[in-house]
């Protein structure tokens, strides 16, 4: 019996091999298979946002002006969510709502679902791009894993939260002032700042900023090979093989400052990865909870005592009153389709009003 060993070669490359060769070719901007998802979705999401903020009104969905054409600026323009009556419709251009009429589609808020869905898939494509490139150059995929944090936040806030509510109407509109309004809405209707998942998110993001600042400063402080350049950026060759800072010196410094310090670079950098990504994931989980209308902490005993004793008040009870004010003043303005009318005597009044 004879066994022939050799490399199997096909006489002619199939379509997959041809596409793979072109997509993964070494070029200035890597395309890759992930680029088939990333580039079209990112293009349509960004293009839809610029189109909406430039030309499209929110008069028919929110009773607002939201475009440059109507007099808004960069901070006040937005691509607004569809009307509440449209619930969770995908608002396809060719769907039963718009029936192929582009103007009507824009008036109904079709650009919001267009931007949100293409944006979500664009972010996923960017994460897949990091996976693909990491595999190509034989790196571990931690960059892609880290980027899952922002994706989780985007998907939870813009997609899962409104899916748990009555419609896309209650998602954030894509604009600076619109996001601020959404933050106030979250506080007034969900007491979001007292939610433990929000607390973990704040700790993660601000803790990561602190770690980043400390790490950068420590590396700069422990440089031990000065070059001939006029400053740090000119002094070193970006392709040099050897390190030019001292981990030992940094460890000694922080051991004296705190009593403890990282002695292992892998653990240090994993910690810098873990803190912000975990914070973002926790905040995303919290928003999923809000989609189901799960409540934050309720200190009912303090509320009862504050109601019975005029001299007893805590920062918590003051915040509860502020939330009531936000709801009462915001609901009528924010949800004009409900035709809410609150008599003056039930609207909260205080020093700030």
Curated annotation (Swiss-Prot):
User: What catalytic activity does the UniProt entry give for this protein?
Assistant: 2 a plastoquinone + 4 hnu + 2 H2O = 2 a plastoquinol + O2
Summarize where Fe cation binds, as residue positions. 215, 269
Specify which residues bind chlorophyll a ChlzD2 according to the UniProt entry for this protein: 118
Question: Is Hydrolase a UniProt keyword of this protein?
Answer: no
Locate the residues binding pheophytin a: 130, 143
Q: Which CDD domains match?
A: Photosystem-II_D2 (cd09288)
The record describes how the cofactor is bound as: The D1/D2 heterodimer binds P680, chlorophylls that are the primary electron donor of PSII, and subsequent electron acceptors. It shares a non-heme iron and each subunit binds pheophytin, quinone, additional chlorophylls, carotenoids and lipids. There is also a Cl(-1) ion associated with D1 and D2, which is required for oxygen evolution. The PSII complex binds additional chlorophylls, carotenoids and specific lipids.
Q: Which UniProt keywords apply?
A: Acetylation, Chlorophyll, Chloroplast, Chromophore, Electron transport, Iron, Magnesium, Membrane, Metal-binding, Oxidoreductase, Phosphoprotein, Photosynthesis, Photosystem II, Plastid, Thylakoid, Transmembrane, Transmembrane helix, Transport
Residues modified to N-acetylthreonine: 2
An additional note in the Swiss-Prot or TrEMBL entry is: 2 of the reaction center chlorophylls (ChlD1 and ChlD2) are entirely coordinated by water.
Record text on subunit structure and interactions: PSII is composed of 1 copy each of membrane proteins PsbA, PsbB, PsbC, PsbD, PsbE, PsbF, PsbH, PsbI, PsbJ, PsbK, PsbL, PsbM, PsbT, PsbX, PsbY, PsbZ, Psb30/Ycf12, at least 3 peripheral proteins of the oxygen-evolving complex and a large number of cofactors. It forms dimeric complexes.
Q: Which PANTHER family match?
A: PHOTOSYSTEM II D2 PROTEIN (PTHR33149:SF12), PHOTOSYSTEM II PROTEIN D1 (PTHR33149)
- HAMAP family xrefs: PSII_PsbD_D2
Full protein name? Photosystem II D2 protein
Please tell me the species this chain comes from. Answer: Cicer arietinum (Chickpea)
């Amino acid at each position: 019996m004879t066994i022939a060993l050799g490399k199997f070669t096909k006489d002619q490359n199939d379509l997959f091999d041809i596409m793979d060769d072109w997509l993964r070719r070494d070029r200035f901007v890597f395309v890759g298979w992930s680029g088939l998802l990333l580039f079209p979705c990112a293009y349509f999401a960004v293009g839809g946002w610029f189109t909406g903020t430039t030309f499209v009104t929110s008069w028919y969905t929110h009773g607002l002006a939201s475009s440059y054409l109507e007099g808004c600026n960069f901070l006040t323009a937005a691509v607004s969510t569809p009307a509440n009556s449209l619930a969770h419709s995908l608002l396809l251009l060719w769907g039963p709502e718009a029936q192929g009429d582009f103007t009507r589609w824009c008036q109904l808020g079709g650009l919001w679902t267009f931007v949100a869905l293409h944006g979500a898939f664009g972010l996923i494509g960017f994460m897949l791009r990091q996976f693909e490139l990491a595999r190509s150059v034989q790196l571990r995929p931690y960059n892609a894993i880290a980027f899952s944090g922002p994706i989780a936040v985007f998907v939870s806030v813009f997609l899962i939260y409104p899916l748990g509510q009555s419609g896309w109407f209650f998602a954030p509109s894509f604009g600076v002032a619109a996001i601020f309004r959404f933050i106030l809405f979250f506080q007034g209707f969900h007491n979001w700042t007292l939610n433990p998942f929000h607390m973990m998110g704040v700790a993660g993001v601000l803790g990561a900023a602190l770690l980043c600042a400390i790490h950068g400063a420590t590396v700069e402080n422990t440089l031990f090979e000065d070059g001939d350049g006029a400053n740090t950026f000119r002094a070193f060759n970006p392709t040099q093989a050897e390190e030019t800072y001292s981990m030992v010196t940094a460890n000694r410094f922080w051991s004296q400052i705190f009593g403890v310090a990282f002695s292992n670079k892998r653990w240090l950098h994993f910690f810098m990865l873990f803190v912000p990504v975990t914070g973002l994931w926790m905040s995303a989980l919290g928003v999923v909870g809000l989609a189901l209308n799960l409540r934050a902490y309720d200190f009912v005993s303090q509320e009862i005592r504050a109601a019975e004793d005029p001299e007893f008040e805590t920062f918590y009870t003051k915040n509860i009153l502020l939330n009531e004010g936000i709801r009462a003043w915001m609901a009528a303005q924010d949800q004009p389709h409900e035709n809410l009318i609150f008599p003056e005597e039930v609207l909260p009044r205080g020093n700030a009003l």
